[in-house]
From Swiss-Prot:
Keywords on record: Oxidoreductase, tRNA processing
Listed GO biological process terms: tRNA modification
Residue ranges constituting the Rhodanese domain according to the UniProt record: 124-218
Pfam families (UniProt xref): Rhodanese, UPF0176_N
Protein name, UniProt field: tRNA uridine(34) hydroxylase
Known EC number: 1.14.-.-
Source domain of life: Bacteria
TM segment ranges: none
Catalytic reaction annotation: uridine(34) in tRNA + AH2 + O2 = 5-hydroxyuridine(34) in tRNA + A + H2O
Catalytic residues (UniProt): 178 (cysteine persulfide intermediate)
PROSITE patterns reported in the protein's UniProt record: RHODANESE_3
SUPFAM superfamilies the UniProt entry points to: Rhodanese/Cell cycle control phosphatase
NCBIfam families: PRK00142.1-4
Length: 310
């Protein structure tokens, strides 16, 4: 029986002054353990999603936790039948999740972590303002009931959204969430700096909520977008039914694929009328390479799995 692939999303905000020197040893540890995916290193910590066999993931986590600074690195797991990644990378960044506001540091100030088992009670409080900190295309396919969608295209837009819409003197309790916990943790640090006092965020994010809260008790509605070839996962952490438009990154469902504006790998109903001619030509050329490689039974040229036709 084929061993399932373990997908591990991990992060930790911790000062890593030698983060540049960690790149090569970390890359070697990933390669030695057969781990695919991308990890980001910055002065503020580590972040990324990787996949491997059970032994491979355990080996990488053991290596990471041998560093006293990473002994309690947060991680959550899901499973799939095929490798969702085909490359192994370690990238050096200014931030492990890009907010773009100098001075925001979860290592110095952060909101109150809320365990998944306590999340439903918190967000059911009518005095709590519930904000989804993810991008618009992620929110569109699933979110918590009653959550506010900031309709941001990138996390960099989040600070301006908060300044334009909320007031610390009026909004006394704020709860936030994201896919794996990292974005809302940094958002909570920003909110505290803006004067909000009671700031909460979901520990481990949506994925940890899926892992620990029974589906019959769930307040989640829809699928959750993930940053790998699965595109989305359901509450039981199995792969969803969505594909992804590689022109605009928006998830596409069966209805989208039936649209006259959907062309596999080229455009979808969300972007067909906004793509530049250069982007469209590039997408067409890339799709031709993919179809040719598939016909010749060669590996996917840009590192994805071939999905069955819908």
């Amino acid at each position: 029986m084929t061993q399932p692939i373990v997908v591990a999303a991990l992060y930790k905000f911790v000062t890593l002054e030698d983060y540049a020197e960690l790149r090569e040893p970390l890359l070697k540890a990933m390669l030695d353990n057969g781990v695919k995916g991308t990890l980001l290193l910055a002065n503020e910590g580590i972040n990324g999603t990787v996949s491997a066999t059970r032994e491979g993931i355990d080996g990488l986590l053991t290596w990471l936790r041998s560093d006293p600074r990473l002994v309690d690195v947060d991680h959550k797991e899901s499973y799939c039948d095929e490798q969702p990644f085909y490359r192994t990378k370690v990238k050096l960044k200014k931030e492990i999740v890009t907010l773009g506001v100098p001075g925001v540091d979860p290592n110095n100030a952060v909101g109150t972590y809320v365990e998944p088992k306590d999340w439903n009670a918190l967000i059911s409080d009518p005095e709590v303002l519930l904000i989804d900190t993810r991008n618009d295309y992620e929110v569109a396919i699933g979110t918590f009931k009653g959550a506010i969608d900031p309709k941001t295209e990138t996390f960099r837009e989040f600070p301006e959204y908060i300044k334009a819409n909320f007031d610390p003197s009026k909004h006394k309790k704020v709860a936030m969430f994201c896919t794996g916990g990292i974005r809302c943790e940094k958002a909570s640090s920003y909110m505290l700096g803006e004067g909000f006092e009671a700031v909460y965020h979901l520990k481990g994010g949506i994925l940890k909520y899926f892992e620990e809260v029974p589906q019959e008790e769930s307040l989640w509605d829809g699928d959750c977008f993930v940053f790998d070839n699965r595109v989305t996962v359901r509450h039981d952490l199995t792969e969803g039914e969505y594909d992804q438009c590689h022109a605009c990154r928006h998830p596409v469902n069966a209805q989208d694929r039936a649209s006259e504006h959907y062309s596999p790998g080229v455009s979808c109903p969300h972007c067909w009328d906004s793509l530049s001619e250069k982007t469209r030509r590039s997408a067409i050329d890339r799709q031709k390479q993919i179809e040719l490689a598939k016909a010749r039974n060669l590996p996917h040229p840009i590192g994805y799995n071939y999905k069955a036709e819908a």
